[in-house]
Amino acid sequence: MSDRPGSASEGEGDEIRPYGEDRDSSEESEDDDPEEAKRIAEGFIVDEDEEDGEGEDDEEDEETRRRRRKEEKRRRKKERRMRREREEAELSEDELELIEENRGLREGRPLKRLRRRSGSEGSENDRAVPTLQDMFRDDEDRMEDDDDDLMDFIEEDEEDEANQGETEEQRRERKRAEKLKRREQARSRPELTGVDRSSWDEIFAVFGDGQDYDWALEGEDGMDLDEEEEAAKKDLRLEDVFDPAEIKARRLQDEDKAVANADRPERHQIVNSTLSDNPVFATDTLYPPPDFAAKWVAPKVSFRTQYLFYNQHPEGSYPIPTIDNPQPYPVYRRPDLEIEFEKAVSTALNMMFVQHLEVPYLWHYKRDVFSLLENQGQSSVLFLERDELWQVYVLGQRYRAIHERNEQTRQQWGKIKARKGDIEDEYFTKGLLGKACVASIEAAGEGDEWLAYHYASDIKAIKEEEAFDEVSKKLPERAEREDIRRGRIMKLVEAFGIDANKVASSFQDVHGQPAPVMNPDKMPLELADEFTGAAYSSPEQALSAASFVLVQELSKDPAIRQQARDFMDTCGLVTVNATDRGMSVIDQYHLYYNFKFLTNKPVLDFRDSPQFVHMLKAEEEGLINIAFDIREDMLASFTDALIRCCRSNDYGEIASAWNEVRMEVCNTLVKKHLMPMASKWIKEHLRTQAEEYIAERCREELELRVNVRPYASSGMEQGETPSVLAITNGKGDIRDAVMAVMLDDEGNVRTQTKFDNLRDEEDKTMFIELLEKRKPKVVVIGGFSAQTARLKDAALVAIRQHAIELLGQNPPVSDAYPDHEGFQYAMAEYDEKLKAHLIPLIFVNDATARLYMSSEEAEKEHPNLPLNGRYALGLARYAQNPLNAYCKLGKHIASVTFMEHHQKLIPQEKLLYHLERGLVNSVCFMGIEINSCVADPYQRAMLPYIAGLGPRKADAVIYGIQKHGALINRMAFTDLGLFGPTIFENTAGFLTIESDLKDMMLEAENPQEQPDPLDMTRIHPENYEFAQKMCQDALDLDVEDVADRHKSEVVQTLMLDDKRGKKLGELNLDDFAFNLQRQGEGNKRHTLGEIVSELIRYRSDRRPAFYVPTDWEIVTMVTGETERTVGRGLKVTATVRKAISARVFCQLESGLDAVLERDYVADEDQAPVTSCDEVFKPRQAIKGVVIMPEPARFQVRISTRPSDLRQGVDFVQPFKDEEYNSKDRRDAAEAATAAKKQRRAGKVQRIVNHPNWHVLNSGQAEQFLASQHRGDCVIRPSSKGPDRIAVTWKVDEDVYQHIDVQEIDKPNEYSLGRILMVSGQYRYSDLDDLIINHVKATARKFDEIQMHEKYKPEHELDAFLKNYVQAHPGRSIYGFSVDSDRPGYLKLCFLSKPTKDGGVIQTWPVRVLPGAYKLGNAIVPGVTELSNAFKMQYSEKLAEQGHQGKTPGIYLGKTPMHLGGRTPALGSRTPAMGSRTPALGSRTPALGSRTPALGSRTPAQGGPRY
């Protein structure tokens, strides 16, 4: 391509495949010689005999093993020579490049597929994963001779005879010479490895030829390792050679291999997204009985199922009105089908967790299982929709977690029973584990806590007997309160007559009768007086202690706690209280304003809303506090229900007195324990609920974007891929050229051209020539500024001129027509003719192109393309296949914005999990042609989203198909060992195999070696018999007619029949389905309908047409403006570009054009404006209001009339007004603000004569500094009094430090003090002195630390430490970052071992002073000294802890004093130091207490418990 701007490539040019690769080599081998390709592929398979033989050698003597090794070696040599001519020396490109990078011989490499290779050990599935042994074995293969098999055998025989008389020394010398010869041969044949001769010379020059260490390769008996290699070589792992991060990124860890080899869907083996950088691998545990799980799952599936089958929610509340359907047709409830619905849920759980079938497979091929035929097949009820199946899967996972937690508790109970013999606890086994603890994961955990509370001593003894090495978790109430429950006071507790277990059981049963409560014979205080003494000095204390024990027992009960959570979920109210800072920061233009005065909003109203995550974010920023409450009457009702289960029904003074005490217990229980616990739970519950809602809405938006066909113009057939020309001018700067990239219909880059300006005649002519030569079906355009509109206009002019040339007829001229109407009619006719020759010009969504252009992948694929060229390539790819473009993003898809204000508030892992689900739905809906997918690296990105697969399994499939060649039919998936039975069932229907239908020669024999027409369809192999039977019926053939023929021959005949639609339409599918159901085949109505659709139009694209963005979407994409920012009635600021008499041409800050007409400059009652250029000058800023937005033209029309400006609005809230925002609270706050302003207006405003002085509060100062640099500051009034000022300076992005400055020696109240004191130790003479020597000096220390190699941004520091320690085992690492929580401080974080091995990232604060750093008590001038001070203090801590007998670990280190012991809390001293050692068997005394006597107990208060 010429370097001259505007020049296009001449000729056809080189074919550049997507991803920078040519056509896959599997196509070439298939074309050359299929038999030879098959023979070569067989050479990759390791014989199982080798593996079996190695296991038997252990039982044989040395001589036998040696003989067997020689035989095995000879056999392997023969096999290697047979396949050497076609293999690439066994080292894949990725492995060679990885070696070269580690040697420093290559700077980078394009990202290419990983080639998995077979191992020498393990199962057959294991061989699909590369091992290190394969890599080194390849080197040995490459060094073998190149002679044929017969010569090799001759040489071996001659060698045995010729070498019989040589000595051992001679034999070793001969071996060395042979090895040297082989190395020289390797150097003379560099093409075998793809490394040129000069590169090999460099390698040998740097690393030598290996002879220096030949002595190390000889065994003790002088034998070379060539003969002893299997016996003497140590098994190496990839981790021993390559960087762990590289292995992890390429998914080559042992866990990844296990996932790839297991016959279970990859997404079932990983808890989070399979695309995550930190996958959480799931354990393969036995799933609980699906029937039991269904009873828990079914009522929670969806609003629809609750409404239809459980009679929940108000009548008519479903279907929910939408924008597309504001008045949906009502549906009838079907509570009579509740049992059938639970059976359908049970079946779904069984298929998902027992049979390991993924949701897309169930939805596409088992949908009939989740529906019920009625009216003799004329109608059906669908129990579970697609998204509901996904929800069943999620709920099934939650139930599994609950079940496993309860099983752990049940096992603990079994240990207690084994210890105590005949102990029984029916309430625990039936009431809790059988019912209450199954309600939620929280209740399951509380069941374990309940057991630990009531059987604390038994569990403690069990743990000590089992001699646990790790520090036990804290057992609730195992010190003082456990002692209380073992004391005499329990007699008083029993006198209350309250059995906590019976109370909990009665409390769950609303209509049940509470167990009777017996009263003592004495009054409460009278009876409590009997328990006074050393422990309790008064009856009130004794009664209080007994009440406390009773409250504890009731508050620990999982059933009661679950009731409290359900009550809060149903009746809870949420109120927002703004903090002092929030009152000033959250104004009417703030995103949080819509909930600033939120008051008593019901918890139920937060469902299906993202609002709560915004509230949590505001609370995190310190702007609001969220409070949960319950109406007094509702809370009283809940408390009364609890009191009813505790009170006595007797009458009399004693009964009333005891009932009063019991009532007090219940009130304390509810207010002090249950409601705070429920409030804490509901907060996290609402967070999770809101995050799930946002993630699901993002998934739905993604599916709307990708579930579309490729762009198709009017003349294209459905399913045809367009050739695309993409153009862009980037940011539209004068330096940005117009880049054009042309993709043909196969996705190959055909042209990459640069133009200066399409308005120039020369460039326009060359652009037209490009259109004529390449003939694109569509031109797509994109950019990053409003200048893209001008490029669009220029391109439209060129495209129209090109169409005129094709038409060969010039447009009509107005002068040739007598009137304007005639001219208009002629132009309309001409435009209609021209339309057929016009190439469409469209905008497309550029989210994927923006990410691709700046990715490392794009740079490696197309290093010669500039950024704008890569952006254009991304646009073209999106137009050809939006789904493929999004799939190619991988984990970076989470960076695409789907919900503008909400998406950033949820965890990336959760978002990625849901987005992956959306891609899985979309890819499975369309399906993939497997052979073309494997051959094209760009299409391979879609393969992981097929049901059953994932990135790891997809890599294995790609490697397997490349190894064996293109697949002929679906049976090859299992015949070649690519899929196990489960994965095949999940996957087969979505992977089609294209063949030439007309050229198929089907024979009844050997169907596995022939193509099958049904493999071209999305019909699942398990339904082939139905398809064949339907084709037979459609062709009106009898069984005898097809008996001796290929089963699918009738399918081929029908698919080639042009009238197949009519013939298949004559089949009565309803009767057929009903008869199948009566015969026990189950409901097959949907399956039969799908089979008919596929047979008529196999693999037809049933997705909607390509979505072209609306005008407003284009404006938002290019400029960032929306209807909310430049819509009608909004105030804007514009800059005058040009003024003429009738109008003014302006530009908004975003680049949009603004036009001001003369009539809209002034009101009618003002002096008229005769000429705009007299009033407005270029570069003048004016205030206006939008009166007519014109997004299609990238412009708005504005008015500057005062009357219009008064009616205009400054800002439109992105969220609707909140009905629960209290107007009274808002009015009171506004009145208080107004009063405050009035008071300030009455006061003399303090003014300091300095350019940095501003009358701002702290929040306003931060906003003022937001766009400025580090070290910039604002000096402002202080709220602490007239003798102080405040300095706010920018430490880092979103980090600001507020410095309190005391003024000393003030002449008067309003003058600045002659001495400015900071922190009581830094004195400055004036404000400039303060800024330069305090603020700027401190900022320089922050700049200095950021230049250090150990500095990382705060959000990256933890990952940096973890990755370093993982990559360098046995080494520690530390790093610095700004502490955003403590402005003016740094965080010094360090890690000594990987977190998976128990390592904990520890943090020390470093205060930044003017010109110094302070760590602990050490003040140092520089970063080097700071590092040394850290190392010294760290060493001192280690030494100190070593003397104290503690495990080294700063602050968070744990001291295993004895079994079950715990480390003191942060900052506490080790109790043993400085105090007397307790007697054997007693406890360590608390800090400050005296040593107990022999055998006595340790005082509990004051010190850490062990």
From Swiss-Prot:
Family annotation (SUPFAM superfamilies): Ribonuclease H-like, RuvA domain 2-like, SH2 domain, Tex N-terminal region-like
Highest taxon above the source species: Eukaryota
Keywords: Chromosome, Nucleus, SH2 domain, Transcription
Residues annotated as domain S1 motif: 1129-1201
Basic residues bias (residue ranges): 66-81
GO cellular component: transcription elongation factor complex
InterPro entries named in the record: HHH_9, RNaseH-like_sf, RuvA_2-like, S1_domain, SH2, SH2_dom_sf, Spt6-like_S1, Spt6_acidic_N_dom
Molecular-function annotations in GO: DNA binding; histone binding; nucleosome binding
Skewed-composition ranges (Acidic residues): 24-35, 45-62, 90-99, 141-167
GO biological process, one term: nucleosome organization
Spans annotated as Disordered: 1-194, 1460-1506
Segments of skewed composition (Basic and acidic residues): 14-23, 100-110, 168-190
Locations listed in the record: Nucleus; Chromosome
Residue span, SH2 domain: 1239-1349
Function comment: Histone H3-H4 chaperone that plays a role in maintenance of chromatin structure during RNA polymerase II transcription elongation thereby repressing transcription initiation from cryptic promoters. Mediates the reassembly of nucleosomes onto the promoters of at least a selected set of genes during repression; the nucleosome reassembly is essential for transcriptional repression. Essential for viability.
Family: Belongs to the SPT6 family.
PANTHER family in UniProt: TRANSCRIPTION ELONGATION FACTOR SPT6
Name of the molecule in the record: Transcription elongation factor SPT6
Organism: Cryptococcus neoformans var. neoformans serotype D (strain JEC21 / ATCC MYA-565) (Filobasidiella neoformans)
